[in-house]
Amino acid sequence: MDITPDSIIYWQWQWINLNATIVFSWLVMLILVLGSWLITRNLSIEPPLSRWQVALEIIVEQIRQQIRDASQQKADQFLPFIGTLFLFITMANLLTIFPVYQSPAGSLSTTAALALCVFVAVPIYGIKNVGITNYLRHYIQPTPVMLPFNLISEISRTVSLAIRLFGNIMSTSLLVAILISIVPLFFPAVMTLFGLLVGVIQAYVFTILAMVYIASGMNLQQRKTGNHHA
């Protein structure tokens, strides 16, 4: 039983290896790119709309609404980044319905990379919205003594974001595999559905936390400057 897709090696040459994490990450990206191209190539504003376009509009509007609820900010500027995170993690977890597939989210390297993207996005959005001086100033609030603690807080929440997603996906996959091996005649369908549900929930939790982290740096300064957006 493989706990993480990192341990499944398909090809190796010296220190370079091609493992399941890399293969299935590219598979998920390929599916998302092709799916996006197929759905958006014939978009229309006149009815009747295709079922795929209706489904896409529902998904985009739901993501936009969740961004507004979580951040109390206008959603459009965050939609490409937050939407991509959600769709990638969700698709990566939903494909576990296929027996040979291993979710890349079950690898700590994948979740660390996703958390690192959030870590970089936080100052980018913060500086873009409140300016570099106002953004950097929040690291010394309420006093300059808090600078190291605020920096540690930034790093620790990024680490927790990566470990939370990795731990939940890995533990769920392990639990499903154990139960299926114990009672293979009764639990496979139920446990597979349970794994899919947990995967979608974890994608939702990860993206909402990412949005909250991004909004937090902006809100701190907007409250000070009186430019808070409703």
UniProtKB/Swiss-Prot annotation:
Coiled coil: none annotated. The keyword Membrane applies. GO terms for cellular component: plasma membrane-derived thylakoid membrane; proton-transporting ATP synthase complex. The chain crosses the membrane at residues 20-40, 78-98, 112-132, 174-194, 195-215. InterPro entries: Alt_ATP_synth_F0_Asu, ATP_syn_F0_a_bact/chloroplast, ATP_synth_F0_asu, ATP_synth_F0_asu_AS, F0_ATP_A_sf. Keywords: ATP synthesis, CF(0), Hydrogen ion transport, Ion transport, Membrane, Thylakoid, Transmembrane, Transmembrane helix, Transport. One of its GO terms (biological process) is proton motive force-driven plasma membrane ATP synthesis. It holds the Pfam family ATP-synt_A. The keyword Transmembrane helix applies. It is found in: Cellular thylakoid membrane. GO terms for molecular function: proton-transporting ATP synthase activity, rotational mechanism. It is a multi-pass membrane protein. Its main location: membrane. Gene3D superfamilies: ATP synthase, F0 complex, subunit A. SUPFAM superfamilies: F1F0 ATP synthase subunit A. Key component of the proton channel; it plays a direct role in the translocation of protons across the membrane. PANTHER family: ATP SYNTHASE SUBUNIT A, CHLOROPLASTIC. F-type ATPases have 2 components, CF(1) - the catalytic core - and CF(0) - the membrane proton channel. CF(1) has five subunits: alpha(3), beta(3), gamma(1), delta(1), epsilon(1). CF(0) has four main subunits: a, b, b' and c. Belongs to the ATPase A chain family. This is ATP synthase subunit a 1.
